[in-house]
């Protein structure tokens, strides 16, 4: 998805897994223009990469067709909401799908904090790049397979974009997202019986 569009630099967010083995990058736009791209910054923890494209070779008419996505408020997403997945949800570029939010997991533990995970009955292919939109056309999440259940329920998982807006700004400016690598775990009663005092470890 296009995050920002200026002639000197168009910024595109993509899953790292989709491009990490590529020797070079080429970005195709809707009017069939193809331009070379380069990695601006990568977030290894979340598996996302910001790609930059120099669009100064495009004329004004071509450039005006490049529209950055509007970031939505994923905290406002509710169970039962209609959502649309775009990108490569069917494993093919420019495919799309629609479905409903089935469940929202709040405060899911992850490295250095918590995040929301959205579950939807919708087609999605995380490694090829699938992004989740609300009915206003706003980006509310991106596909991940890290939190999918072992049993195939048909539910696909998406990370909340609102939890990631600060990191997205860093990537857009070519700044590495800092992480301490802390993963919290609640001390269970069984662990307490074995002599581990309550606290954060």
Indicate residue ranges for each PLM-predicted region.
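Terminal peptide-recognition signature
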Residues: 10-14, 37, 51, 80, ...
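Conserved active-site neighborhood of the chymotrypsin/trypsin-like protease fold
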Residues: 4-87, 91-92, 126
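Active-site region of chymotrypsin-like
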Residues: 56-68, 97-157, 198-201
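C-terminal cap/linker of serine protease catalytic domains
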Residues: 37, 139-198
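Short flexible coil/turn linkers enriched for glycine and charged/polar residues
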Residues: 31-33, 42-46, 112-114, 173-176, ...
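Residues located in well-ordered beta-strands
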Residues: 1, 36-38, 96, 100, ...
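Extracytoplasmic/secreted envelope proteins and their assembly/folding machinery
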Residues: 77, 83, 98, 129, ...
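Residue-level recognition of beta-strand microenvironments
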Residues: 3-5, 40-42, 104, 123, ...
């Amino acid at each position: 998805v296009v995050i920002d569009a200026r002639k000197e630099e168009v910024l595109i967010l993509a899953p790292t897994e989709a491009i990490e083995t590529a020797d070079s990058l080429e970005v195709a736009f809707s009017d069939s223009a193809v331009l070379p791209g380069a990695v601006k910054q990568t977030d290894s923890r979340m598996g996302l990469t910001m790609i930059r494209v120099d669009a100064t070779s495009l004329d004004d008419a071509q450039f005006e067709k490049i529209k950055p996505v509007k970031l939505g408020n994923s905290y406002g997403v509710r169970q039962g909401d209609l959502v649309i997945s775009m990108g490569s949800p069917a494993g093919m570029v420019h495919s799309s799908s629609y479905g409903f939010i089935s469940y929202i997991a709040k405060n899911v533990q992850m490295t250095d904090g918590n995040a929301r995970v959205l579950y939807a009955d919708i087609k999605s292919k995380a490694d090829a790049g699938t992004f989740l939109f609300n009915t206003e056309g706003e980006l509310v999440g991106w596909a991940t397979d890290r939190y999918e259940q072992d049993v195939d329920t048909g539910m696909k998982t998406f990370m909340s974009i609102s939890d990631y807006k600060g990191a997205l700004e860093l990537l857009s400016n070519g700044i590495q997202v800092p992480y301490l690598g802390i993963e919290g775990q609640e001390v269970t009663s069984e662990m307490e019986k074995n002599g581990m005092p309550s606290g954060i470890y």
